[in-house]
């Protein structure tokens, strides 16, 4: 008999109790599979003075030379390997298994929440594996979808402008360590999106704990070499300058989306660059993640943030009701969204369950050795 379960999208948990996110580790990754745990070499630093903003930066400049390494690479963009390597290093330091119910990337959890607030149902297509008393979630697709339109098209320039803004607003090193010629030539540098820096955070809602991996755009002020840097991270976004009612509605939706993205892992600061129809940067504004729900109070999304937390609690509780057996009791499920509900269906795919696509062999062996060391 095949196990199946569903959760209606209008379901909500009464509680909005949240656990304070805490950084467990971080890693740097490049296209091609290069990955360095507890390494900040790909961490960037925010620096965009008013004098630069006043130059009306063209966020479409250089699109033809854009090195879209993520789109061109053959990498498995849904792989949990970097997250699990960082988690393994954390467990090695602590000599114990991390206390968590769900392990996933922020992007997957965001999709699960967003599907109840106008997100595309097709965005929810995931595998859930029960292993060692925990649930591991990854995207079913190994490759993200990237724009296929011509580089001079509006759709492609809208996609590119976000990366261009990051290139103009971020430095590879703190500004005090950056040569003047580098600062002055940022506008001429070719934009590329291969190198990434990711944080691994433990958080929770209601009675359940999650470990989430998430890409970080950069540091806003300074980095603490031995501390938790969540309070120093910043998220960058580009939005169209608000001039019409439609612009305002779109911006409110974007604010809700970025709040959800940052709230999930405890990033406290958002910087949004406002552009015109020709992708010229007109202004830059800083937002506190905690203040965004207050800003949305006077809009059509007045209750969206609290409602999202209640839905987050409901879906997490539902997932954690899945049977979670001992170390070698693997159970595999497909998670999807359709007809106003989330659906879980058990799979009997031994190749997928025993392969490295979801939980690699080296992580399974690590957990076995950890279990034996505690049992001896």
Swiss-Prot record:
GO-annotated molecular function: exonuclease activity; metal ion binding; mRNA 5'-diphosphatase activity; nucleotide binding; RNA binding
Binding site residues for a divalent metal cation: 166, 217, 235-236
Q: Is Nucleotide-binding tagged as a keyword?
A: yes
Write out the residues that bind substrate.
105-107, 215, 237, 261
EC number per UniProt = 3.6.1.-, 3.1.13.-
- The highest taxon in the source lineage is Eukaryota
Q: Which GO terms describe its cellular component?
A: cytosol; nucleus
Q: Which reaction does it catalyse?
A: a 5'-end NAD(+)-phospho-ribonucleoside in mRNA + H2O = a 5'-end phospho-ribonucleoside in mRNA + NAD(+) + H(+); a 5'-end (N(7)-methyl 5'-triphosphoguanosine)-ribonucleoside-ribonucleotide in mRNA + H2O = a (N(7)-methyl 5'-triphosphoguanosine)-nucleoside + a 5'-end phospho-ribonucleoside in mRNA + H(+); a 5'-end triphospho-ribonucleoside in mRNA + H2O = a 5'-end phospho-ribonucleoside in mRNA + diphosphate + H(+)
Q: Enzyme group, top EC level?
A: hydrolase
Keyword check for S-adenosyl-L-methionine: no
Q: Name one GO biological process term.
A: mRNA processing
Q: Which PANTHER family match?
A: DECAPPING AND EXORIBONUCLEASE PROTEIN, DOM-3 RELATED
What protein family does this chain belong to? Answer: Belongs to the DXO/Dom3Z family.
Protein name, UniProt field: Decapping nuclease RAI1
Please tell me the species this chain comes from: Eremothecium gossypii (strain ATCC 10895 / CBS 109.51 / FGSC 9923 / NRRL Y-1056)
């Amino acid at each position: 008999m095949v196990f199946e379960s569903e959760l209606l999208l209008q379901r909500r948990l009464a509680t909005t109790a949240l656990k304070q996110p805490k950084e467990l580790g971080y890693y740097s990754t490049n296209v091609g599979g290069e990955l360095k745990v507890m390494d900040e070499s790909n961490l960037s630093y925010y620096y965009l003075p008013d004098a630069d903003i006043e130059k009306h930066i063209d966020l479409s400049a250089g699109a033809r030379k854009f090195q879209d390494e993520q789109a061109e690479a053959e990498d498995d963009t849904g792989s949990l390997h970097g997250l699990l390597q960082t988690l393994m290093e954390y467990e090695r330091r602590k000599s114990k298994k991390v206390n968590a119910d769900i392990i996933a990337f922020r992007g997957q959890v965001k999709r699960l929440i967003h599907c109840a607030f106008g997100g595309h149902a097709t965005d929810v297509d995931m595998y859930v594996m029960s292993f060692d008393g925990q649930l591991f979630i990854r995207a079913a697709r190994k490759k993200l979808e990237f724009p296929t339109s011509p580089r001079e098209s509006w759709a492609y320039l809208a996609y590119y402008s976000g990366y261009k803004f990051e290139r103009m607003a971020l430095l590879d090193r703190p500004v005090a360590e950056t040569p003047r010629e580098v600062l002055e030539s940022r506008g001429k540098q070719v934009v590329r999106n291969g190198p990434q820096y990711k944080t691994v955070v433990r958080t929770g809602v209601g009675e359940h704990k999650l470990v989430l991996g998430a890409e970080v755009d950069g540091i806003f002020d300074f980095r603490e070499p031995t501390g938790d840097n969540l309070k120093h991270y910043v998220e960058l976004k580009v939005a169209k300058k608000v001039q019409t009612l439609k612009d305002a509605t779109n911006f409110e939706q974007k604010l809700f989306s970025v709040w959800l993205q940052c709230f999930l892992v405890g990033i406290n600061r958002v910087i949004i660059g406002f552009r015109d129809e020709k992708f010229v940067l007109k202004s830059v504004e800083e937002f506190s993640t905690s203040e965004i729900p207050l800003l949305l109070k006077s809009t059509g999304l007045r209750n969206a943030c609290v409602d999202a937390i209640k839905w987050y609690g409901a879906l997490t509780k539902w997932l954690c009701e899945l049977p979670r057996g001992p170390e070698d009791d693997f159970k595999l499920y497909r998670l999807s969204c359709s007809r106003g509900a989330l659906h879980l269906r058990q799979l009997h795919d031994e190749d997928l369950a025993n392969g490295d696509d979801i939980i690699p062999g080296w992580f399974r062996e690590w957990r076995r050795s950890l279990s034996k060391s505690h049992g001896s």
